[in-house]
Amino acid sequence: MLSDIIKNILTIDKRNLKENIRPMISELKERLNSNFDLLKEANNVDISKNNGFKLDLNIINNIFANVLKEPFTYGDITVSFKDDEKKIIYGKEIFDVGNVIVINEGNFYVTLELLLRNLLAGNTTIFVNYGYMFGSNNFLINEMESILKNYDISQNLFQIYVTEDYDEVLSYNANIDLIVCIGNKFLQNMILRKSKVKTIITGYDNFDLYIESKVNLGFLNEILKTGLNINLYIKDDLNLNHSQAMLVHDINEAISQINYTGNRYSSAIFTSNSLNASKFINEVKSKIITIN
C-alpha cells in the first residue's frame, strides 16, 4: 500500500550515504553488466506480455557514463568565495531535496537515469507508473536494494509503486517535497493541474516525428523499433501504414499538431524539401529539433 511506502520513507537514516554514493553507483553498474543475462530474462517476460522493449547494455552503460560526469554529490561542500585577507573560505553544503515522486510511463532507461541522479542528490525516491516494464524495473530496484543493504543504508531509499490512480499519490502532498513528471503532454498537464507541491514536468525521452517524404525510411523503421515514446505524424498522401500515426494534410497542420499535442522535448522532420525543413525548425516549439 502507498500509505506503508510513505510511512517507511519518513524514517530513513542517511548517515552512511554521503561517502558511499559513488561506490554504490559503480557496484550497480558492475551488477547490471555481470547479471545482464538475468536482466534479459526479466526483460523477455515484459516483452512476451507486450509490456516492454528489448534492452541494450550499451545504452545502459552510456547512462552510467553520463551520470558519473556530474561533479557534485549529496553532502559535498563547494567553495563559493575565498577571502585571503581574513583567511575565511565561504562555501555551501549540498543537501537533498527530500522525498521525491517520479511519475513516468515506466521506461527502464528513464528509471535507471533518475535512480542514479537521485542517488547522487541523496533523495528518497518513489517511482510511480502503471506497470510498464515492471519486470525489468523491479530487477533494477531489487539490485539497488541489495546494494543499499550491504552499505547499511535503508532499502526504502528507492521504491516502485504501480498505479493508475495519480490522485491517490498526489493526496500525500504533506509528505512529498518534489514531483518529477516525465511523459506526454496530457500526463504533464494533469499532474501540474492537480499537484500541490513543487513540480517539474518534462517530455524527456518523448519524441515527435513528422514524415512528409519517404527519405530515410530505413532509419525511421529502426527508430520505431527502439521502444522509445514516439508521436508519429505522417503526411496523408504518402500511403504509409502505421497504426499509431496521426495523418496530417501538410507541414502547417503538422506543426500545429506538434505544438498543441506534442511533448516539447525532441521533434524531427523527415523531408526532402528545404523550405519545409526551415519552417519546421523556426516554428516547432521543442528543445531539440532535427532534420532527416
List where the protein language model places each region.
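N-terminal Rossmann-like NAD(P)+-binding subdomain of aldehyde/semialdehyde dehydrogenases
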Residues: M1-G91
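Conserved C-terminal structural/oligomerization subdomain of aldehyde/semialdehyde dehydrogenase
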Residues: D4, N8-E27, E222-N229, D236-N292
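ALDH superfamily catalytic-core signature
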Residues: E30-S34, I147-N150, K185-Q244, D250, ...
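Conserved small-residue-rich beta-alpha loop and adjacent elements
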Residues: K69, T73, T78-I147, Y151, ...
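A structured beta-alpha segment of the ubiquitous adenosine-cofactor-binding alpha/beta core
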Residues: E85-K92, F158-D177
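Hydrophobic/aromatic ligand-binding patch that stacks against planar heteroaromatic rings
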Residues: R117-L119, M190-I191, F280
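Short hydrophobic alpha-helical runs that function as membrane-insertion/retention elements
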Residues: T124-V128, V180, T199-I201, S267-F270, ...
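Short, structured coil segments at secondary-structure junctions
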Residues: A174-N175, K194-K196, V284-K285
